[in-house]
Structures are given as structure tokens and as C-alpha cells.
């Protein structure tokens, strides 16, 4: 009986912790934006950009392409103590013809917040730093209902004349909730849709300036709870500066491929002949082409 009550208490605590974390995820970025906004006119180190573009959201296993339009706001600020702060808020409007999720509202959101600082500089090119990332995603056509990733970490950074590289490792909180419509048709019920864990992440990236105006970057990142992988992500970006049109503007091609480990949602052994994953697909790809303009 004591063991049962203890398990119930732990479950209740995790539920309350998740509720407070989701509220924090909403309120913390708002506070950051307000803080940056109050300094925008007083500090030249604050920069605002906005983007406008088109996208294709691909679910390859269903041969699904969802096209649409998107835009975002980018805020970057460097404090007096050389701490770099950034906030990126994305909104996507889909032309949803495939209806992978029959009740999908054709609008979804993505956000990224970061605080970055330097711990030690070994040379003009090589440094050790720290970084705190908060990332979120809501209501994708691939049935991601809510996602939150909060990861402080350490970084090793190389900044050459034409090449850049970074290795990042961190530990933090990972949460992914699947939209309920498709899972219900596969035998899953309320309470089966969310997965939250203390987790670890490792990321590596490399960038090359092909010309003074044309730059490319490749990155790979994984999240793991210590026993199994949670998510893998691969990113590619290519930018072309268009200062001739407006100083600080650029064309940006961005590709993000994400793989999800759905075994964490299994109600029975994944080796059972009757096992059905919570979704009939386990990856998605965002292809985005945008014009970035200073505000």
C-alpha cells in the first residue's frame, strides 16, 4: 500500500511539474521579448529581423507534401557582459490537402530561445562556452501536438576565416505530446499521448563560407534519455546576402529532418506481433525558403 501511494505521489508530482513547465515555457519567452523590446531603442546591440517565405512539410512514409506560407520574428541582443540572447518565433500556414490528421487546424508554430556566453578563449579561433536552449513546437501536420526541449549545455567553438564548427553537449528536459486523433484509431487512449524525460543531448555543426555572400551550414543533433534515443534531427541551411537590396537582408534555404522514437509510447512489447506504433510514420521534414529582412 505504501509503495502504491508513493507511486501515485510521484505520478502526481510529475504531472504538476509538467503543468508548471508548460506555463513557464509560455511566460518565460514573453518576459524575454519584453526585456529585449525595452532595450531596442537604447541599445544598438539589439537587432530585429522578420522573414517571409514558403515551405513544404513532408511526411515521406505517407508520400505527403503540405505546402504553405510562413513568417517569423527574430530578435538578437548582446548584453554589456557579452551574453548573446536570441528569440525566434515562427508561424506556418498550411494548405493541408492530405489530411494525415483529419482534425488538423492548418496553422502551426515553432519557437527557439537561446542564451550564449563564453567561458574561456584558447585562441582567436577556439573557445569554450555555455549555452541554454529552449525550443518548442505545436500543432504540426505530422501530429506533434506539443513539444518542449529545455537544455543547458557546454560548447566547444571554432571560428575560422571561412569555416566554423561547434560541438555542444547538455542535459535537461524533453517533452513530446502526440495529437490524439490518429492514435485513437490505433488503440491508444488519453494518457498515452505524452512522453516527458530528463535527457541528454549532443550536437555537432560545421559551416563554410563558399563566397563572401554565400554560406552553408550542416548540423546533426540527438536527444537520449540514457536508455534509448528520443529524437534525432538533421539541419541544413544556405544563405545568400542581399545587401545590394537592403543592408542585412538575405535569402535563406532551410531544411530540417526529424526522426522520433515512438517506442516510448508503446502499450505492449514492441516485439509483439500485434504491436501498432502510436503513429504510422516516425519522421518529418521541413523545407523552407525565406527572405530575411532587418526591421
Language model feature labels by segment:
Residues 236-242, 279-295:
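Outer-membrane beta-barrel "beta-signal"
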Residues 42-99, 286, 294:
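Short glycine/proline- and aromatic-enriched beta-strand/turn motifs that initiate or cap beta-hairpins
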